[in-house]
A protein has these predicted regions:
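Basic nucleic-acid-binding alpha-helical/helix-turn surface characteristic of O6-alkylguanine DNA
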Residues: 1-125, 172-180
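Short glycine/proline- and charge-enriched loop/turn segments
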Residues: 50-53, 150, 163
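Short amphipathic alpha-helical/adjacent loop interface patches that line ligand
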Residues: 70, 135, 163
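…primarily DNA-binding HTH/wHTH and HhH modules…
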Residues: 152-180
């Protein structure tokens, strides 16, 4: 007897950006992973789970969705932040985490907020540590802009992909968000 296992294909692409290499992973409908690294294994490690219990096959090279994602990232670095903010993504999480990620996607480029402000804006006052953990497990960097979250004392804080990348993204957004 031959067993046929349903397999889904995930495509992956790495591009050069002003903030360094950026790798994305997605199927035909949404992104599952994205981060400032050329190391696909690192992006894969950031993904907590994939939907469904089917097999996944990783294929290098962009499909139509990743071509659109590449365009969205290029537009981001040209100062058009909307395509990244509204791009289709998926990541597993609790209702709390999904609310925090949704709040982050609604923040404006150039806006910075503390972890406690993020928790408050998400409807969970006092859940500062949980909001910080939610940022730490974000598997779709840039598309969920955790880089906009700073410490209450105004310092930059940590960033899973590289602290200098966080600084560069904050400065990029501050500079371009002020444009007329």
């Amino acid at each position: 007897m031959i067993l046929c296992v349903n397999r889904r294909v995930l495509h992956t692409v790495t591009i050069d950006t002003p903030a360094g290499e950026f790798t994305m992973l997605g199927d035909n409908s949404r992104l599952y992973g994205a981060g400032f690294t050329g190391d696909l294994a690192r992006v894969m490690a950031s993904i907590r789970a994939l939907p469904d219990d089917v097999g996944w096959e990783i294929r290098p090279g962009a499909n139509q969705l990743l071509e659109q994602a590449v365009d969205a990232v290029k537009q981001y670095f040209e100062g058009n932040f909307e395509p990244v903010a509204s791009f289709p993504i998926w990541q597993q999480g609790t209702p709390f985490r999904h609310q925090v990620w949704s709040t982050l996607r609604q923040t404006k480029a150039g806006q910075r907020l503390s972890y406690s402000q993020l928790a408050d804006a998400s409807g969970f006052p006092g859940a500062t540590r949980a909001a910080a953990t939610t940022c730490a497990v974000n598997s779709v960097g840039l598309f969920i802009p955790c880089h906009r979250v700073i410490r209450a004392d105004g310092s930059i804080g940590k960033f899973g992909w590289n602290q200098q990348v966080k600084v560069d993204l904050i400065e990029h957004e501050a500079r371009l968000a002020r444009r007329p």
